[in-house]
């Protein structure tokens, strides 16, 4: 069925939003066939964002694990993460649709920075909604967004994190449909957003496939990526679905799955409806969306993209989780072994290397972003303070 991945996805939104989603779908279907759009998009990815990103052979990490480990270096993109791929695509689409105002939600701030960057590039007004809790955790990104000309609105309702920021952005969109384009930052939300975001991010997997064939002469045994909403994982996995490569999505295990303080929707969630989409949602016995926890602001989300729900159900991708402490260990390990400071989100994928037997295997880890934004929260974390004294 259109707009669904198996039983997941759809458009579970107020009636007032349906015309906007229909307008967006029609515009997107039009640009899918427009070669000039894709030329402009790809030129910007190359000349402005810095694609293709390298597939880097991590020599010392490989020696430690007895494997051949490659890092897909999305951290080297302009603004420091994979989010810019989608932001450029959607803001360009908004411009073609005649919109003048851009809004977005952000958790770790990376999508907010990327959207503010793209809005500045195209000369558009920009408002970013961010949970108040996240504005404290990610202060440098808040300052960046303001410098880029965006208005940052701290959201004080609910758990004051990503899901609340999305709620506020949706309220804004409903009020300003004529002028405003809502840039969703992950493969979540109502149709057609999950498909749009995945298609703007699949460049990651397409490049990876070409690069690994050049370097190894074959496809990898494993590809590992972190999963919050799931856009970096969808971007690298999509070109490898049904290729024989073992694909592993790593969720935020927080303080442990048994504690309830985590953000592992696919492992511990139930089927429900969140932000316009049918997917796996962390909810209580009454169906109320639960408060999530992760050391990483970008994975702190109580749902997950519907395509991931479908991949989980069909066994096309394996999903697991690592804890805050395991991710912090991986953050320090990559910094010390390779001189690369990873984002806390990406550190969850790196931490998974300890959980599987990869001896003699070729493994690609999607290094979705850099860790500058996380330095303060990592260095102030009691678990880390003991380890790097």
UniProtKB/Swiss-Prot annotation:
The modification N6-(pyridoxal phosphate)lysine is found at residue 83. Gene3D superfamilies: 3.40.50.1100. It comes from the Bacteria. Its EC number is 4.2.1.20. GO terms for molecular function: tryptophan synthase activity. GO terms for cellular component: cytoplasm. Its cofactor is pyridoxal 5'-phosphate. It catalyses: (1S,2R)-1-C-(indol-3-yl)glycerol 3-phosphate + L-serine = D-glyceraldehyde 3-phosphate + L-tryptophan + H2O. CDD domains: Trp-synth_B. GO terms for biological process: L-tryptophan biosynthetic process. It is an enzyme of class 4 (lyase). SUPFAM superfamilies: Tryptophan synthase beta subunit-like PLP-dependent enzymes. PROSITE patterns: TRP_SYNTHASE_BETA. InterPro entries: Trp_synth_b_CS, Trp_synth_beta, Trp_synth_beta/beta-like, TrpB-like_PALP, TrpB-like_PALP_sf. Tetramer of two alpha and two beta chains. Belongs to the TrpB family. This is Tryptophan synthase beta chain 1. It comes from Thermotoga maritima (strain ATCC 43589 / DSM 3109 / JCM 10099 / NBRC 100826 / MSB8). The gene is trpB1.
């Amino acid at each position: 069925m259109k707009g669904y991945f198996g039983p997941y996805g759809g458009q579970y939104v107020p009636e007032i939003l349906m015309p906007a989603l229909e307008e967006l779908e029609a515009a997107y279907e039009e640009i899918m066939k427009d070669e000039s759009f894709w030329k402009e998009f790809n030129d910007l990815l190359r000349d402005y964002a810095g694609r293709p990103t390298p597939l880097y052979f991590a020599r010392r990490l490989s020696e430690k694990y007895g494997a051949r480990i490659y890092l897909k270096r999305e951290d080297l993109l302009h603004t420091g993460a994979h989010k810019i791929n989608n932001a450029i695509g959607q803001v360009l689409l908004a411009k073609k649709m005649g919109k003048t105002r851009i809004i977005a939600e952000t958790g770790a701030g990376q999508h907010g920075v990327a959207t503010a960057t793209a809005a500045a590039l195209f000369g558009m007004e920009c408002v970013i909604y961010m949970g108040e809790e996240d504005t404290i955790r990610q202060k440098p990104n808040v300052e960046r967004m303001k410098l880029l000309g965006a208005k940052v609105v701290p959201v004080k309702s609910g758990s004051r994190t990503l899901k609340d920021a999305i709620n506020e952005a949706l309220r804004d969109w409903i009020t300003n449909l004529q002028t405003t384009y809502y840039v969703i930052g992950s493969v979540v939300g109502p149709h057609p957003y999950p498909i749009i975001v995945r298609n703007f991010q699949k460049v990651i997997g397409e490049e990876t496939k070409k690069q690994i064939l050049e370097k190894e002469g074959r496809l990898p045994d494993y590809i590992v990526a972190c999963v919050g909403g799931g856009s970096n994982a969808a971007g690298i996995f999509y070109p490898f679905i049904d290729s024989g490569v073992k694909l592993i999505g790593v969720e935020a295990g927080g303080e442990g799955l048994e504690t309830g303080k985590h953000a592992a929707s696919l492992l511990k969630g139930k089927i429900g409806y969140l932000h316009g989409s049918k997917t796996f949602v962390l909810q209580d016995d009454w169906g109320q969306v639960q408060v999530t926890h992760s050391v990483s602001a970008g994975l702190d989300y109580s749902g997950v993209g519907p395509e991931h729900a479908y991949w989980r159900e069909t066994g096309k991708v394996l999903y697991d989780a690592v804890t805050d402490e395991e991710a912090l260990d991986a953050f320090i390990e990559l910094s010390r072994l390779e001189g690369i400071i990873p984002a806390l989100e990406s550190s969850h994928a790196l931490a998974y290397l300890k959980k599987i037997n990869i001896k003699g295997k070729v493994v690609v880890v999607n290094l979705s972003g850099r860790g500058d934004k996380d330095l303060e929260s990592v260095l102030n974390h009691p678990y880390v303070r003991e380890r790097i004294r």
